[in-house]
Swiss-Prot record:
Organism listed in the record: Methanothermobacter thermautotrophicus (strain ATCC 29096 / DSM 1053 / JCM 10044 / NBRC 100330 / Delta H) (Methanobacterium thermoautotrophicum)
Catalytic activity: pretRNA = a 3'-half-tRNA molecule with a 5'-OH end + a 5'-half-tRNA molecule with a 2',3'-cyclic phosphate end + an intron with a 2',3'-cyclic phosphate and a 5'-hydroxyl terminus
CDD domains found in the cross-reference section: tRNA-intron_lyase_C (cd22363)
UniProt cross-references to InterPro entries, sorted A to Z: tRNA_endonuc-like_dom_sf, tRNA_intron_Endo_cat-like_sf, tRNA_intron_Endonuc_cat-like, tRNA_intron_Endonuc_N, tRNA_intron_Endonuc_N_sf, tRNA_splic, tRNA_splic_arch_short
Stated name of the protein: tRNA-splicing endonuclease
Family: Belongs to the tRNA-intron endonuclease family. Archaeal short subfamily.
GO CC terms in record: cytoplasm
Amino acid sequence: MRVEGQLGDEVVTIKATSIARRLHGKSHYGKMYEDRLQLSLIEAAYLMERGKLKLMKDDDEVSPEEFISLLGERGLYSKYLVYRDLRNRGYIVKTGFKYGAEFRLYERGGAPGRTHSAYLVRVISENDTIHALDFSSYVRVAHGVNKKLLMAFLDDEEDITYYLVDWIRP
């Protein structure tokens, strides 16, 4: 079953139907408001790829190719690839914005409101430079909020390698 969503500047909005409530309640997509479900662009791309979302911009349908192109233009494509990989592995993935990370990751069986996220996920392309002070701050923030840091390195072939980073006291 496909639900229709409206593409805005930063989010996709879906009317609060039973399907939208199920997407949020059972699968933990987006943020539910009284009258609507609000999805991030990355969540919307994933649901679109899985055939669960028909995306509209005003009265025109947005094709999956157009939407993936939009993600690329906004610098979100690499984040989407990591999000998709983690979701396909059965994890609940939510924004990590307030922690300075791309995502928060819940263990399988965990969920927002029932458990705390276990990991913060940082997405790094293989050609990116990571400065030691930045890397140190990623680890310290994760440790400070009782989470582990998962670094997702994306290569030019779109393969992802994960490294679990933990803080230790010298």
